Amino acid sequence: MKKCAIPNRAITVLTGSMKITSISQPIVEFPFLNAGKRVGDFYVDRLPVHIATVEHLPDGLDAIIATADLQGRERFQEANGHPIRLLGEVLPQKLIDEVIPKLQMPTGRIGVVLAGDFYTVPALNKRGGTGDVSEVWQSFARQYDWIVGVAGNHDTFGDQPSPTYSPTNASFLDTQTAVHDTIRFGGVSGIIGNPNRHWRSTVEQYCEKIEQVVSEKTDVLVLHDGPDAPDSGGKGNVMVRELLELLPPTLVIRGHAHWKSPLAELDNGTQVLNVDARCVLLVRETAAVN
């Protein structure tokens, strides 16, 4: 398994358990149907799955799955004549069948971080459709021990913009925090934009929400939108990055804008894991891929 080591810097670094020390090249790529711009324009795309090692995970927790922007659907041959499901509905079982058996998981306890945008229109003829992602959350909740997550700007939950209920092992975050396996997660849903539109806030509002969440001493900050990464050309918001660099170092998991490199480190030691259109499993350094 090829890994890209994270260079050490002479700066304050992440405290606690969640410092990422390496991230692999994709160990598998799952084919799926991606939407085109008109009827019949859909095509087969691939979802890469990476393994990231962290310095420490709480006792009893073997892995955390992080993903976002799974805006596709399963292939027709996998649907067995049924309506094709969202990629996020089928991914939980695919990971169990093809990825998790390759890892050393003494307890089998796994958590999930969902960073938003899991909908694609059934006809696969439109990019950026908005719709119900409740079944994605339910599917991950059935297969894994707990979920934390935020809404993307294309997500609804039934006829509601945010969940009126969720699986008992799931925590929906929009300026809230939740603790699972001693890790405190905080989250901000939506993106920066016109606040009169679905799941959008002004940049000032978005930054205020981040400050509120981080003030609760979060270990992991989950965002849909997020900071840029100028050193590697990663798209994002400059003001969010500048704010995060003034706050205590943390691990940020974000989606919304795809980066060529999934991991960046800000000037204050904050790490940003970009999971847009990819899936990353965070495991202990001692976990081996068979």
Each model region followed by its residue ranges:
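N-terminal active-site segment of His-dependent metallophosphoesterases
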Residues: K3-E135, E208-K217, V222
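Short beta->alpha connector loops
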Residues: P48, L70, Q93-L95, G129-V133, ...
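Conserved catalytic scaffold of divalent metal-dependent phosphoesterases
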Residues: I51-L57, I64-R75, Q104-M105, F118-A123, ...
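Cap/insert and terminal regions of metallo-dependent hydrolase folds
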Residues: L91-V99, Y119-T120, L124-V133, L221-L263
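Short C-terminal domain-edge/linker segments immediately following a structured domain
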Residues: L95-P101, Q143-D145, A178-T182, V214-V220, ...
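A structural signal for short coil/turn segments at secondary-structure junctions
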Residues: T107, R142-Y144, L247
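Active-site surface patch of divalent metal-dependent phosphodiester/phosphate bond hydrolases
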Residues: G128-W146, V150
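Conserved beta-sheet core of the metallophosphoesterase superfamily
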Residues: W146-G149, P163-N169, P230-N290
